[in-house]
Amino acid sequence: MIHKDFLAEKLKLFAEACTRPLFEAHLHGDLSNIGEVEAAIGELLEMNPDVCMQLAPASLTTMMSLQGIGNAVSQEVAYVLRHIARVYEKTGDQAHASARLSQAEAIERAFSCDGTQCPKEFEEFEQTIC
């Protein structure tokens, strides 16, 4: 029960850290704070954010498995990576868009999740951008 509560709190904080920068990026094409979202992914996965975002998709999923929380956070991470990819694509940065989408798809395959489905922590965000 304590682990479940701890994980729920981590996911809540993750969603809070991601929501505003993703909203600004979607609404205004403002990528200035997208690094905060990428840092939040690293923190959630208990990895150095700079290293985490540079990992090849297969390496990222391996590290998530080794951390032992991959199954518990995979949908949320894949969902956020897909949004980052979409924002990069909208602003013409195809290289970063492709990298983030590849990471999201690898997570979805490795952990049998669907990053296109909105996790409950992001429902309010999803409603504001649609």
Please place each PLM-identified region on the residue numbering.
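The tetratricopeptide repeat
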Residues: 73-76, 80, 117-125
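Charged low-complexity stretches with an acidic bias
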Residues: 63-97
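N-terminal alpha-helical interaction modules that lie
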Residues: 1-74, 109, 128-130
